[in-house]
C-alpha cells in the first residue's frame, strides 16, 4: 500500500530556545516596548517570561493557540453562579421579550449564561444549500464509502488518488471540506409474519440482538464550504442594499451549484447522496439540517425546513451544554443527559496510508470524528513551505530530517502531484455516565497511540474543540496544521462497510440483517440489485455458493437463511396485482448427515429420510405423461443400465425407449405399479447375452440388488402437501453408494424442479459436490443455474471442500452463475483452490485462512459489493441454536419424532424442544 510522508515540519511551530517563534516574538516585542516607553527595567522580565514559556511549551507545542482559543470562550464569571461550571444555554434569555406586567426578578440569573447559538454559524436554508452568517455556502453529501476489508491494496490506493485529485482540482477556488464519521446507536429489525411458533420465536429473539445497546451505525458525511467573500469583502457586502445582496447571493448560489455538480461527479465511486429537502406526511424536512443538528447534540432527529434563522432553532434537542476542564455534559430538553469528551492530535505519525484510521470504526464507542481541510492555492502553499523552512533553519531547529522533508514537499508541490491545506482533527466520544465516557475516551486515546498518533484529551480549549465540529466555524479550529492533500485523503479515506439493501429487493425486504465487525447492520439478499426498485421482478439472479470447513458454521448459516426466507411465504409479501393462486413459495433442502432434520421439523416442513437398502417409495413411472417427463424418464432409465460406463447401441436404446413409451402410454398412472418390472415385460431385447440390456435392467427390478430404489408400488416423492412449504430430503446413505447416487440425485432433482412454475422457489443443497458429481445430474444443475431465475427461483449450494467442489464438471459455470459467494473460515484452505477455482483475490483468500472459525464470520462476495458479516445467535436461546444444526447425538431421537405419524406440528415441536432442553 502506498504511503506518504506526513511533513511533520508543517505540523509543529518553528522553535527557538524551546519556544514557538511567533509567541516568543510577541513577548519579546511587548517587553521591549515596555522598556522603551515605561521603564528600562521592564526588559528584565523577558528572561523569566521566556523560561516560563519554554516550560509550558515542553508540555504542548500548540498550547499558546489553545490558550488563545480559551480566552475567546471566556464568559461572565457570574454565569457560573448557578451551575458552578461554564454553561451554554440553547437560547439567549436576554433576547426574550420582557413582560412589563412582572417585576424584573433574577433569582437564578439565566440571562447571564451565554447561549451557544452564537457558535452556530448557519443562517438560511436555500433548498439543499445552507448559507452562514458570514455568507459562506454549505452543501453536504452522505457517502456509503468504499469497502476496504478484503479489497486489493491497488484498488484502495486508487480511491485515495481520486480524493487527492478532487482536492487538487479546487486549490484555485475558495472552498473548504469537512469530513465527519459519526458512529451512533442503531436499532432495526425486519417485519415478518410467520405462521409458525418456532420461526416467530427465533425471529423475535434474533432481532433482540439488534437493540441500540448492541448495534451501531457508521455514517459518513462530506461537507463543502464555499467562501465567496474575503474578510474585507464581507464587511463591504453587509453594507450593500438588500437588492444588491440578493442579486450577488443568487450568483454565489449558482456558482455553488456548479461546484456541487463537479463534487458529486468526483464522489461517484463513493456512492454519495446529497442531503437536502424531503417530504414526510406533506411536510418539508431537511436531512442537511438534521446532520448539522446531530453535530450539536449527538443524536439524529427529524428537522423541519423553516424560513426562520437556522441558528435560532437548531439546538440538537439540548437545553444546556456544561463544560468542565475535560468533559461535557449534554442536557437534553426531555431531561436526558449524556456526557462527552474530546480527543485531539498532539503529534502525527511519520507516514500516512489510506485508511490509517479505519481501526477506530471497529470500536464499540459512539463518536463523531471531524476532519476539516482548507486547500491553499499553489502559490500560497509554496510561500508557506518556504517560510516554514526558513523559520526552522533560522531558529537552528534540531529537526534536520523535517527540514529535508520540506524540500521534498516543495518538489511534489511543484510537480503538481499534491496540494497543501490547513487541517484539524477531533474525536468527540459520547457516554451515558462520566465513568463510561472516561473509559471509552481512554480506549480511543490508546487506539490512536497504537496507530502511531500522539493523542491527548482536550482540556484547555474544550468548547472550541466541540463547536469546531460545525462546518464553517473556521476561526475556532484548534491545533490547525498544514498537511498535504494525500495525507488528508488517507486520513479521511471514505472507507465504509457495505450495507446491502433493506427493501425494494426482488422479493421485497431483505432476507435478514447480519452484523459487520463494526457492529453495523448488513441487509442480506440472495438476489442481485439491478435497479432502484426490483420488487416483483422475477428474472434476477440469486444463485449462491456457501463455502466453509466443518465447524465454521456453514450448516447453521444455511438453515438460518432458510428459516428467514420463510417469511416470503406470506401472501402479504407478494405484489398486490398478482393473482391469489400465484402467491406461492416452496423451498427444498437436500441434506447430508441429517444436519437440517431438526430445523425442517421445527419450521413445519416435511423431512424425507431415505435409508440404504430399504424401499425408497420412488416410482418414477407415476409421473404425468408429458413430453418433458418422458424425456427425463428415458434419461433416468438409461442411467440405470449404463452406470458402469456401458454404451447402448442404437437398437438397444430404441428398444428401451419403446418399452418405456409402451408403459407410459398404455397404462393409466395408477396402473403403473412397479414400473421397471413393467418395462422389462415390454422389453423385446434378448437376455441370453452376458451383461445384456435386459440383465442390466433386471438389477433394478423388485427383489434384485437395486430393486428397492425405483421399482416400488407407488411414488411417495410428492410435494403436494397443502400446508407444507418446506421439504428436506436426506441423501446420506444414497450418496455414499456410488452405484446408485447419480440416478437417485437425478430423480429427486427432476421432481423438485417440476415445481419451478413461477412461484417463489429456493433449493438448498448441502455438500453439493456429492449430489451433483454425476455428469448427467451436473448438466441438469448447470441448465437450472442459468434458467431458474426466469422462473423466480434460485439455488444455494454448500460445500466444505473446495477441492471436492472443483472436481464437479460444472464448477466454473456455478461460480459464473452465482449472484453471491459466502466464504466462511478455513485455516487449511489451499490457495490454488480458493484463488484458482473460486476466483478469489489474494485478500479474500487471506480472509478465509486467517479468520477464526469460532468467530462465525464470513465474507459476502457479490458483483457490486463485498462485506464481512456474521450471524449473532447469542440471543436466540440454547434450544433454538441446537435446532439449527442437528448433531449426531440427537439424530436417532429426532428420527423417531419425525416418523411418528400420530404427532401434529405442535406436538413434534414440543417433543423436539423437550429433547434438547433435557440435554
Q: Each PLM stretch: what is its role?
A:
Residues 34-43:
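Transmembrane helix interruption/hinge and helix-loop junction motifs
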Residues 505-531:
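N-terminal pre-Walker A segment at the start of P-loop NTPase domains
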Residues 527-552, 556-564, 569-596, 604-615, ...:
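Conserved P-loop NTPase motor cores
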Residues 658, 662-735, 739-758, 848-919:
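Conserved P-loop NTPase motor module
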Amino acid at each position: 500500500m502506498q504511503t506518504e510522508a506526513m511533513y511533520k515540519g508543517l505540523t509543529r511551530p518553528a522553535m527557538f530556545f524551546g519556544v514557538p517563534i511567533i509567541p516568543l516574538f510577541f513577548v519579546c516585542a511587548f517587553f521591549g516596548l515596555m522598556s522603551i516607553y515605561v521603564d528600562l527595567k521592564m526588559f528584565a522580565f523577558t528572561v523569566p517570561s521566556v523560561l516560563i514559556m519554554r516550560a509550558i511549551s515542553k508540555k504542548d507545542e500548540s498550547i499558546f493557540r489553545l490558550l488563545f482559543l480559551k480566552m475567546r470562550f471566556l464568559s461572565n464569571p457570574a454565569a457560573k453562579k448557578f451551575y458552578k461550571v461554564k454553561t451554554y444555554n440553547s437560547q439567549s434569555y436576554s433576547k426574550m421579550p420582557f413582560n412589563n406586567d412582572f417585576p424584573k426578578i433574577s433569582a437564578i440569573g439565566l440571562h447571564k449564561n451565554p447561549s451557544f447559538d452564537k457558535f452556530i454559524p448557519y443562517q438560511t436554508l436555500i433548498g439543499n444549500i445552507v448559507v452562514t452568517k458570514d455568507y459562506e455556502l454549505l452543501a453536504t453529501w452522505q457517502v456509503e464509502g468504499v469497502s476496504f476489508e478484503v479489497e486489493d491494496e491497488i484498488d484502495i490506493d486508487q480511491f485515495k488518488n481520486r480524493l487527492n485529485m478532487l482536492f487538487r482540482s479546487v486549490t484555485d477556488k475558495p472552498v473548504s471540506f469537512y469530513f465527519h464519521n459519526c458512529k451512533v446507536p442503531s436499532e432495526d429489525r425486519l417485519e415478518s409474519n410467520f405462521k409458525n411458533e418456532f420461526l416467530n420465536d427465533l425471529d423475535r429473539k434474533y432481532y433482540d440482538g439488534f437493540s441500540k445497546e448492541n448495534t451501531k451505525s457508521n455514517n459518513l458525511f462530506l461537507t463543502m464550504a464555499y467562501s465567496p467573500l474575503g474578510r474585507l469583502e464581507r464587511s463591504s457586502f453587509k453594507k450593500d442594499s438588500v437588492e444588491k445582496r440578493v442579486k450577488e447571493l443568487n450568483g454565489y448560489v449558482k456558482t455553488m451549484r456548479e461546484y456541487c455538480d463537479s463534487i458529486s461527479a468526483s464522489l461517484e465511486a463513493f456512492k454519495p447522496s446529497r442531503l437536502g429537502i424531503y417530504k414526510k406526511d406533506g411536510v418539508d424536512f431537511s436531512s442537511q439540517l438534521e446532520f448539522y443538528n446531530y453535530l450539536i447534540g449527538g443524536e439524529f432527529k427529524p428537522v423541519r425546513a423553516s424560513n426562520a434563522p437556522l441558528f435560532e432553532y437548531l439546538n440538537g434537542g439540548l437545553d444546556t451544554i456544561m463544560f468542565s476542564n475535560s468533559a461535557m455534559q449534554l442536557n437534553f430538553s426531555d431531561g436526558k443527559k449524556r456526557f462527552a469528551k474530546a480527543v485531539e492530535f498532539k503529534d502525527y505519525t511519520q507516514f500516512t496510508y489510506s485508511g490509517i484510521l479505519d481501526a477506530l470504526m471497529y470500536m464499540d464507542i459512539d463518536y463523531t470524528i471531524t476532519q476539516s481541510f482548507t486547500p491553499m492555492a499553489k502559490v500560497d502553499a509554496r510561500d508557506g513551505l518556504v517560510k516554514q523552512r526558513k523559520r526552522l533553519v533560522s531558529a537552528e531547529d534540531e529537526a534536520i530530517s523535517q527540514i529535508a522533508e520540506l524540500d521534498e514537499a516543495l518538489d511534489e508541490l511543484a510537480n503538481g502531484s499534491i496540494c497543501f491545506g490547513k487541517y484539524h482533527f477531533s474525536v468527540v466520544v459520547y457516554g451515558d455516565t462520566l465513568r463510561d465516557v472516561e473509559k471509552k475516551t481512554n480506549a480511543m486515546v490508546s487506539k490512536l497511540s497504537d496507530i502511531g498518533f500522539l493523542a491527548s484529551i482536550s482540556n484547555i480549549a474544550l468548547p472550541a474543540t466541540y463547536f469546531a465540529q460545525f462546518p464553517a466555524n473556521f476561526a475556532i479550529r484548534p491545533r490547525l496544521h498544514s498537511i498535504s492533500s494525500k495525507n488528508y485523503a488517507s486520513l479521511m479515506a471514505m472507507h465504509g462497510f457495505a450495507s446491502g439493501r433493506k427493501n425494494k429487493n426482488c422479493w421485497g425486504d431483505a432476507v435478514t440483517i447480519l452484523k459487520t465487525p463494526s457492529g453495523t447492520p448488513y441487509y442480506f439478499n440472495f438476489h442481485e440489485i439491478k435497479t432502484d426498485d426490483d420488487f416483483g421482478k422475477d428474472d434476477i439472479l440469486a444463485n449462491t455458493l456457501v463455502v466453509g470447513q466443518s465447524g465454521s458454521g456453514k450448516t447453521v448459516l444455511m438453515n438460518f437463511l432458510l428459516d428467514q426466507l420463510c417469511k416470503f411465504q406470506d401472501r402479504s409479501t407478494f405484489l398486490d396485482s398478482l393473482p391469489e393462486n400465484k402467491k406461492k413459495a416452496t423451498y427444498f433442502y437436500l441434506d447430508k448427515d441429517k444436519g437440517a432434520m431438526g430445523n425442517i421439523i421445527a419450521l413445519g416442513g416435511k423431512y424425507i429420510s431415505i435409508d440404504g437398502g430399504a424401499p425408497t417409495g420412488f416410482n418414477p413411472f407415476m409421473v404425468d405423461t408429458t413430453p418433458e417427463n418422458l424425456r427425463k424418464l428415458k434419461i433416468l432409465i438409461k442411467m440405470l443400465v449404463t452406470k458402469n460406463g456401458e454404451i447402448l447401441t442404437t437398437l438397444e436404446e430404441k428398444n428401451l425407449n419403446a418399452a418405456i413409451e409402451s408403459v407410459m402410454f398404455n397404462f393409466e398412472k395408477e396402473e403403473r405399479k412397479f414400473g421397471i418390472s413393467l418395462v422389462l415385460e415390454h422389453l423385446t431385447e434378448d437376455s441370453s447375452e452376458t451383461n445384456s440390456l435386459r440383465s442390466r435392467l433386471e438389477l433394478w427390478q423388485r427383489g434384485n440388488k437395486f430393486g428397492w430404489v425405483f421399482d416400488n408400488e407407488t411414488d411417495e416423492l410428492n410435494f403436494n402437501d397443502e400446508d407444507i412449504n418446506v421439504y428436506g430430503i436426506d441423501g446420506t446413505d444414497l450418496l455414499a453408494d456410488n452405484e446408485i447416487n447419480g440416478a437417485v440425485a437425478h430423480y429427486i432433482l427432476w421432481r423438485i424442479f417440476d415445481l419451478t412454475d413461477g412461484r417463489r422457489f429456493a433449493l438448498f443443497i448441502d455438500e453439493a459436490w456429492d449430489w451433483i458429481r454425476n455428469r448427467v445430474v451436473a448438466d441438469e444443475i448447470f441448465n437450472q443455474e442459468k434458467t431458474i431465475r426466469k422462473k423466480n427461483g434460485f439455488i444455494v449450494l454448500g460445500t466444505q471442500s473446495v477441492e471436492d467442489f472443483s472436481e464437479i464438471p460444472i464448477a466454473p459455470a456455478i461460480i459464473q452463475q452465482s449472484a453471491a459467494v459466502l466464504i466462511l473460515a478455513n485455516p487449511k484452505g489451499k490457495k490454488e483452490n480458493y484463488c484458482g477455482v473460486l476466483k478469489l483475490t489474494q485478500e479474500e483468500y487471506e480472509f478465509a485462512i486467517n479468520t477464526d472459525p469460532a468467530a462465525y464470520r464470513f465474507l459476502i462476495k457479490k458483483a457490486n459489493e463485498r462485506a464481512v458479516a456474521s450471524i449473532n445467535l447469542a440471543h436466540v436461546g440454547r434450544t433454538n441454536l441446537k435446532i439449527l444444526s442437528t448433531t449426531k447425538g440427537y439424530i436417532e431421537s429426532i428420527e423417531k419424532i419425525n416418523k411418528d405419524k400420530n404427532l401434529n406440528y405442535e406436538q413434534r415441536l414440543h417433543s423436539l424442544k423437550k429433547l434438547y432442553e433435557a440435554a
